[in-house]
């Protein structure tokens, strides 16, 4: 006779939502009046990963999640944590979710991924082929990094003609990316948005470099635990997506964590799959955060989980032809009072010194007067943070008319 399974705890979707928001740093507290490097570091340690993306329609994506939670913080604090030398260096770049910034403490947990990459696993097929066939080029590029220190691909580019594939990358650029994936080099800093590569031992703390090597199963299990803590609650797919882990090791790792008592299985009302959370979790009575969210924010980057939690279908339409877009080019969800209440198409028009609001779409049942005032305040604060004196409401929808009224009643100017 099979052993009787323990009864799984059940929570409502509202409780799951509050648990997720709280775990992700939306706990309803007012942001600190003065944000310090400690606030930035603590938040990133809590999230575990910031996704990097090259789109700069508003601001580079890795800056936005901190703004959504901390408010008007100096972007240089993240730059220092990510790319400074010495004690201020708290982060490293690697393939976490996608291209990501991660706390340096997670570096040992990524070595298995680096080892796989060096064997051509878990990387693009063309890069794996390059790694097999171009070891002479790779060795030459690695030697140049050893001798010259932090350098970019342009420094090594010997190509005379356009190469064609790989986004028109030179052989040296592909070699650097292969070395980066394999952990042979890391990102020492950036020149604009260009990566500057150096040897890990010249960039990262010695305690991290000399950390005893972990078994892959142990490292993967630790990443899963970090993901559960960061998400608050999630299905197996939600959790393994956080650090882009494969299904089989994720299932095994979660089962081991349950057996160890590090996490527990629960049921969320309306979810078809079982969920996981920490054993001693506390659901907030309410969450009062209001925030504009990056499309690459870890709260919403797993779109099916976003639909289950918030009943909110969201797709980024940057690569959708203009005439086929439903909501706009660069649309930020607006989180207000535990729900995603609106979508705002925004652009930083830096030459004109203004934040342009190109579309305002309310989600059912819409924003009440207080919610619309909160949106106006968020937009004004965002413009201030970006150093843009003006806000242009360039939309003829009824929601935009309500937003104009909210701006005027709050004493904010707009165009």
Regions found by a protein language model. Give the residues of each.
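Long, charged, low-complexity, helical-prone intrinsically disordered regions
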Residues: 1-415
């Amino acid at each position: 006779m099979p052993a009787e399974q323990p009864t799984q705890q059940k929570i409502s979707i509202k409780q799951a939502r509050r648990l997720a928001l709280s775990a992700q740093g939306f706990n309803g507290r007012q942001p600190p009046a003065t944000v310090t490097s400690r606030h930035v570091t603590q938040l990133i340690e809590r999230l575990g990963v910031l996704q990097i993306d090259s789109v700069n329609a508003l601001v580079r994506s890795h800056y936005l999640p901190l703004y959504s939670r901390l408010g008007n913080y100096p972007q240089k604090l993240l730059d220092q944590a990510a790319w400074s030398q010495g004690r201020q260096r708290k982060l490293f770049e690697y393939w976490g979710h996608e291209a990501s910034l991660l706390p340096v403490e997670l570096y040992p947990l990524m070595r298995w991924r680096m080892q796989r990459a060096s064997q051509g696993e878990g990387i693009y097929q063309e890069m794996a082929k390059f790694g097999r066939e171009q070891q002479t080029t790779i060795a030459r590029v690695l030697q140049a990094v050893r001798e010259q220190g932090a350098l970019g691909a342009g420094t090594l580019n010997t190509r005379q003609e356009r190469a064609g594939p790989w986004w028109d990358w030179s052989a040296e650029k592909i070699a650097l990316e292969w070395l980066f994936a394999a952990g042979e080099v890391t990102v020492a800093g950036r020149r604009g948005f260009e990566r500057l590569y150096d040897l890990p031992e010249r960039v990262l703390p010695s305690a991290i470099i000399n950390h005893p090597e972990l078994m892959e199963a142990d490292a993967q299990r630790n990443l899963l635990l970090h993901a559960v803590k960061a998400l608050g609650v999630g299905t197996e797919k939600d959790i393994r997506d956080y650090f882009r882990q494969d299904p089989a090791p994720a299932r095994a790792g979660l089962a081991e964590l349950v057996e160890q008592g590090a996490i527990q299985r629960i049921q969320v009302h309306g979810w078809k799959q079982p969920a996981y959370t920490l054993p001693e979790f506390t659901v907030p009575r309410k969450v009062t955060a209001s925030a504009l969210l990056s499309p690459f924010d870890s709260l919403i980057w797993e779109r099916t989980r976003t639909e289950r939690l918030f009943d909110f279908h969201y797709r980024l339409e940057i690569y959708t032809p203009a005439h086929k877009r439903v909501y706009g080019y660069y649309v930020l969800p607006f989180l207000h009072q535990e729900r995603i209440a609106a979508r705002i198409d925004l652009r930083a028009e830096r030459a004109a010194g203004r934040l342009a609001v190109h579309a305002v779409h309310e989600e059912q049942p819409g924003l009440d007067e207080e919610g619309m005032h909160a949106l106006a305040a968020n937009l004004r604060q965002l413009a201030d943070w970006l150093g843009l004196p003006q806000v242009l409401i360039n939309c003829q929808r009824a929601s935009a008319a309500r937003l104009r009224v909210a701006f005027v009643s709050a004493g904010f100017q707009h165009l």
